[in-house]
């Protein structure tokens, strides 16, 4: 080997990316299990997913509260005992409630799987929702809300979603002191009984599994029809966006910083323009070298960071441009955002910039597939949205092959300043 000669540089777009296929098993009671095996490290990730997000709420906050309190006590274990069991084995048991789904995720060493699965089973199948835990949850969440409501960026995030989707839509509905006060144990138990059932459960496993992993899963989750059977119909909920487009809110009259949000509705991931828009959004504001960062951060110095993102909601998406800037330059920041929108409409993206973004996006995907935990997350995202590997590969081809002319047409269609909601919170 001649070490005076550097190895050839290979662009990310030249890599032939393959999404490692999963193995699928079915427990005795019908629960599907999706598996990505890896023996690189003696660690395991086990995630249970339920259709128990805010989309299915009849009362505000019941999805998040139910999900949180399931880990805070069962008929056999107190919250302290659950946490001590997990911590003693160096593991993590996390729970999250999103718009559509709710999850429980266990990370542990492979050798501790058999000891920890009974704890997870207890949390999923036998939560007791203690009154004192609900009271503590309300108190803590109200304190957090009171603190966050003093922050302009938190307030801006709440309002922009309300403007885009409406006060009563799950994507636009926000927490409140009254909503926390209204939470009742009976309501949470009813939500739990309806949504956390065996036939609504899907299991995703990644990492180095013990040899008897499937037998263990079957023992704890597959032998009975726990919590009964519940047939859920995903309701169609109307979106009611605000009629006005421009808003200025003074949350703190003496504030020196403002939170800027510029956003518009956009079709969801099933629309053919969505993969193309991911490329345009990256050029515009999706990475550190974007148009917005180069102009508003590097050139003008108005902010430490400005980004544009595409929401990945199931019903409808949105384009959201967000930053925090000095109070006296918020309006100037908005003007520069619109200038960059119009620049993409009027001038094709130079080939050098497009090639750079292609390599950045493909490189990011390569990084996202580094390891079994990352691969199962990619598959989970596809499976939960009724998509397959063709969607993944089509997106890669879009990144590699989209032209500057196509991007310019997208900008003309979706980057019209008059279509955007505009919000400043100081």
Please describe what each predicted stretch is:
Residues 1-82, 189-295, 334, 420-426:
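His/Glu-rich zincin catalytic helix
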Residues 1-6, 26, 81-232, 267, ...:
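Charge-rich, well-structured scaffold segments of protease-associated domains
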């Amino acid at each position: 080997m001649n070490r005076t000669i550097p190895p050839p540089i290979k662009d990310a777009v030249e890599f032939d990316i393959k999404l490692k296929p999963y193995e699928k098993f079915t427990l005795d009671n019908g629960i599907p299990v999706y598996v990505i095996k890896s023996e690189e490290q003696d660690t395991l990730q086990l995630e249970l997913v339920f259709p128990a997000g805010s989309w299915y709420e009849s009362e505000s906050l019941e999805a998040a509260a139910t999900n949180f309190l399931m880990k805070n006590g069962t008929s056999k274990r107190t919250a302290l005992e659950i946490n001590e069991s997990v911590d003693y084995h160096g593991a993590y048991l996390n729970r999250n409630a999103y718009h559509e789904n709710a999850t429980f995720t266990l990370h542990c060493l492979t050798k501790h799987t058999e000891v920890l699965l009974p704890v997870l089973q207890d949390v999923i199948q036998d939560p007791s929702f203690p009154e004192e835990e609900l009271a503590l949850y309300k108190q803590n969440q109200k304190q957090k809300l009171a603190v966050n409501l003093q922050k302009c960026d938190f307030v801006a995030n709440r309002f922009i979603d309300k403007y885009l989707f409406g006060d009563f839509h799950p994507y636009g509905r926000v927490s409140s002191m009254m909503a926390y006060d209204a939470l009742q144990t009976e309501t949470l138990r009813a939500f739990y009984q309806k949504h956390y059932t065996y036939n609504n459960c899907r299991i995703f496993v990644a990492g180095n599994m013990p040899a008897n992993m499937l037998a263990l899963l079957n023992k704890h989750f597959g032998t009975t029809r726990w919590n009964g059977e519940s047939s859920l119909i995903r309701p169609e909920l109307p979106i009611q966006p605000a009629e006005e487009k421009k808003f200025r809110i003074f949350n703190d009259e003496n504030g020196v910083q403002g939170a800027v949000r510029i956003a518009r509705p956009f079709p969801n991931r099933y629309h053919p323009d969505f993969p193309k828009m991911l490329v345009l959004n990256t050029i515009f504001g999706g990475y550190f070298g974007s148009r917005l960062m180069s102009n508003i951060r590097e050139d003008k110095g108005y902010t430490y960071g400005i980004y544009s993102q595409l929401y990945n909601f199931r019903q409808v998406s949105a384009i959201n441009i967000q930053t925090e800037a000095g109070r006296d330059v918020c309006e100037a920041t908005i003007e520069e955002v619109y200038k960059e929108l119009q620049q993409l409409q009027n001038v094709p993206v130079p080939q050098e910039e497009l090639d750079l973004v292609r390599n950045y996006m493909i490189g990011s995907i390569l990084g996202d597939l580094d390891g079994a935990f990352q691969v199962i997350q990619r598959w989970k995202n596809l499976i939960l949205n009724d998509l397959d590997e063709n969607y993944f590969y089509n997106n890669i081809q879009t990144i590699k092959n989209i032209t500057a002319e196509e991007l310019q047409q997208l900008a003309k269609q979706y980057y019209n300043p008059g279509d955007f909601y505009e919000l400043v919170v100081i």
